[in-house]
């Protein structure tokens, strides 16, 4: 799939400073999500001395860190709860017409993944970086019913032989 099929959304830009003899020197960090709105989404955090460079790097990292989301009628196959650091996110499947009920950070990721109906809740720390990573980890852990059946069949087969 060509790189141009991906939509890019900036979630966060932050400025950090270090002290030099002549004063403060700034660096920028950018958190960017890329997705095709058809089940593929990636997240990247880029750091550089200038904002455009940081955003460019973040986009590059996001394209290297893609996740395939198993969508079912515009929602996810099952409820999932994931912790990342002190942040926790809960994703719940929703009926068609519900929309994306989510905070700004999970909303950006879920919309670019192609999710149209979902309920979410952020718990614990609301740090946008940790929430973004928790959301991506939740999407990475999603399994369809067929996936689980295939995995369990493999386990049963392995146990029978062992």
From Swiss-Prot:
Domain of life per record: Bacteria
Matches recorded under SUPFAM superfamilies: dsRNA-binding domain-like (SSF54768), Ribosomal protein S5 domain 2-like (SSF54211)
Keyword field contains Ribonucleoprotein: yes
GO cellular component: small ribosomal subunit
Keywords for the protein's UniProt record, in alphabetical order: Ribonucleoprotein, Ribosomal protein, RNA-binding, rRNA-binding
GO biological process: translation
Entry-linked Pfam families: Ribosomal_S5, Ribosomal_S5_C
Residue pairs linked by disulfide bridges in the UniProt entry: none
Extra remark beyond the main annotation: Is positioned such that it could physically interact with spectinomycin.
Function: With S4 and S12 plays an important role in translational accuracy.
Entry's family note: Belongs to the universal ribosomal protein uS5 family.
HAMAP family reported for this sequence: Ribosomal_uS5_B
Record text about domains: The N-terminal domain interacts with the head of the 30S subunit; the C-terminal domain interacts with the body and contacts protein S4. The interaction surface between S4 and S5 is involved in control of translational fidelity.
Subunit and partners: Part of the 30S ribosomal subunit. Contacts proteins S4 and S8.
Name of the protein in its database record: Small ribosomal subunit protein uS5
Organism: Thermus thermophilus (strain ATCC 27634 / DSM 579 / HB8)
Species classification: Bacteria, Thermotogati, Deinococcota, Deinococci, Thermales
